[in-house]
Amino acid sequence: MTEAYIVEAVRTPVGRRGGGLGAAHPADLGAHVLKELIARSGVDPAAVEDVVFGCLDTVGPQAGDIARTSWLAAGLPEEVPGVTVDRQCGSSQQALHFAAQGVLSGTQDLVVAGGTQNMTQIPIAFASRRAAEPLGLTQGPYAGSEGWRARYGDAPVNQFHGAQLIAEKWDISRRDMEEFALTSHHRAIRAIDEGRFARETVAYGDVTADEGPRRDTTLEKMAGLRPVVEGGTITAACSSQVSDGAAALLIASERAVAEHGLTPRARVHHLSVRGEDPIRMLSAPIPATAYALKKTGLTIDAIDLVEINEAFAPVVLAWLKETGADPERVNVNGGAIALGHPLGATGARLMTTLLHELERTGGRYGLQTMCEGGGQANVTIVERL
């Protein structure tokens, strides 16, 4: 059977909204990690057969197939194509899946996967809610569909509503969420201070480290925040941060490894994606993880490290309750609550961090998953080599 290997992975630091990456064109963010990826791997860029990038809200500077634009903005060969993927927050994890599947199928040998996003310039959901207003289209992507309304009625379709439903279903208190959020900040700060992210990041201008972690946050400060929705328990403190950034990985076949003298760092062990209730939206990592473990014959205890996106604290806390995973193996260097969530780049960022942490700790198996719009979740399991 053909194998798909991760041979290189790199990311920018994650910038806060309006921070050090806020003025950067998203294609330049993508180009930055692509140039670094090629330089670190030493591969001939003309040998790359496709560039698969994740990106959401593809309007303005993020329109026009930003995978292709990023590659060309990096000064790399024009004969290499690119394609942009939108599986909502899982877009660049899906980009990795498509890249690996191309290699596993035997139709491709060397593919780049990644993602880029500038949320400072293009706010979340701008494309679905405001971009079409000049055309007289004021409804979101669901309200105008007769089929959708017949099936789901007029129930709210948004992340905050989904997060609140999860908190209520799994009996997760506001205090639980705030304690989890504080731990995320503490872990991220420790990782930065210990240099754990040094190998996986490439500075962008003066931005040399992730800007999101808050050294001065406390449970008392979190307790003083107002809920996002009146009467709810979800606050900004237990939500992921609006962010900017990019990440990229190089996926290679056994033949490409031999031909280009590459060193495989991890083997793609499993790829899958599952769907669930689109109104609750954010709980799909639970059944998706169960599905992946059943398919592979692995147990959750066999997984050395997990990166599950911290879109909201209850997403991870509910997943922990259902899977029985050891919290000390999950998001060990903090997550999106502290580090930020640059939407279309986050999936690739998570895998980049997971790979480097497996190497640092000597772990064997790593699992990545994340909630996605529409009630979906990708799961990727890799084996460190």
Model-derived regions, located:
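Condensing-enzyme catalytic core mediating Claisen C-C bond formation in acyl metabolism
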Residues: M1-A24, E36, Y142, E220-S283, ...
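N-terminal extracellular/periplasmic Venus flytrap/periplasmic-binding protein-like
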Residues: R11-T12, A23-H32, R40, D176-E259, ...
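Conserved beta-ketoacyl condensing-enzyme motif
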Residues: G22-V111, T116-P134, T201-A209, I300-E322
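Conserved catalytic cysteine-centered active-site region
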Residues: A24, C55-D109, G153-Q159, D216-Q241, ...
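Short, well-ordered amphipathic alpha-helical segments that serve as non-catalytic structural scaffolds
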Residues: P26-G42, I66-S70, A95-F98, Q159-I166, ...
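Active-site-proximal alpha-helical scaffold in enzymes
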Residues: D86-Q117, A167-R196, A248-R255, P342-T361, ...
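Flexible glycine-/small-residue-enriched beta->alpha junction loops
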Residues: L110-L165
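Active-site pocket-lining segment
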Residues: G162-Q164, F197-E200, V207, H269-A338
